[in-house]
């Protein structure tokens, strides 16, 4: 039944992201609670606070107390799109990964992040914006992963078109 596949209603909650630096990091615009939840495999309610410092992000959550690089966060829509400098920062960060096979690619959870954002997109135009964003950073994914992401994008787009 198609109606049972509707994404949940938008939930408005107070942000737990606090900017502690007077000089924001260029990648600070991509820090989101959704990304933190996927990064650490926790729920929104488990996050106590996220502090954005000059060079790192401090995440304090239930069972988590960790410093995270800004380059670990995927881009998002609704803010300035990623620039060439952002691409360089991401690639430099990925080269530091211990897994040889993934040194040229984004972390695996980025795929989950984009699929989740496709699913939560309230309108076709927002979904299209997410699709364009993934298209600009397709270098970050293997061919198989990119095919999976765009396959899900196509299914989600079709569902939203049928609903709208």
Regions found by a protein language model. Give the residues of each.
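N-terminal accessory interaction module
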Residues: 3-97
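Residue-level marker of intrinsically disordered, low-complexity segments enriched
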Residues: 8-10, 16, 132, 147, ...
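Short amphipathic alpha-helical segments that mediate assembly, nucleic-acid/protein binding
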Residues: 32, 111, 124-127, 146, ...
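Surface-exposed polar/charged interaction patches
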Residues: 42, 97, 116, 120-124, ...
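Amphipathic, non-membrane alpha-helical rod segments
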Residues: 57-67, 124-144
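Repeat-associated, polar segments at repeat-unit boundaries in modular proteins
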Residues: 70-106, 141-164
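N-terminal acidic leader/helix
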Residues: 103-121
